[in-house]
């Protein structure tokens, strides 16, 4: 019986690669943790602490400058209790004044603006006294401020209530002896959806073309001359869709988390040293 000759097996040289020949396995997909799920952090941090945000001007952001300012701001907050308040909240500020007999002055009004960052942060209170609108601008970290009280904690439809200058006086009139209203802990901050009525023109700004929600029927009250001029007015209503501009002018989530952790560390160090028991990072809506 014929049998075929056995074939000789020739071993070829094997090339050893520096990497594994088998394909790498894909990394497991991790669920993104939202700010609400991060333990101890406040979801509404940009609204409660706008003074700790980065500058909206990209070229003015300096990490070292922001770090030094935050240290001074935290030390100042250890000496004075700065409560939570928003644009639209009714706030009372007691400041020292050497020219008065009592050596201090107390002003009550609605917060219409919060602007600037860091140690330069300012907020404006407005009230009507004897049918005259009075606005007082306070530096939040001014050492002459002795006490800040939130008499009524609430929000408005807009983040800037400058249109109260042209509104009827009844929308910015508050009693100086107003009693503070307690806000239940853990409940959302109420939003006052009141829409103000403006005085007859002329106004300080063209509110009929401004993107504000807190004014009632500005087009009807506008003068015919401005209505005819509307087709020549440049309205940049497309800016709200510009994602790149919003990214450059707003603070990132990573920066907010970093600042909050730094504030928590500062609190723990002061509490461990027994210097104070005051809390800096707090929120009426997130507290349980």
Curated annotation (Swiss-Prot):
The keyword Ribonucleoprotein applies. InterPro entries: Ribosomal_bL19, Ribosomal_bL19_sf, Translation_prot_SH3-like_sf. Keywords: Mitochondrion, Ribonucleoprotein, Ribosomal protein, Transit peptide. Gene3D superfamilies: 2.30.30.790. One of its GO terms (molecular function) is structural constituent of ribosome. Its main location: mitochondrion. GO terms for biological process: translation. It is found in: Mitochondrion. GO terms for cellular component: mitochondrial large ribosomal subunit. It comes from the Eukaryota. The keyword Ribonucleoprotein applies. Transmembrane segments: none annotated. Belongs to the bacterial ribosomal protein bL19 family. This is Large ribosomal subunit protein bL19m. It comes from Caenorhabditis elegans.
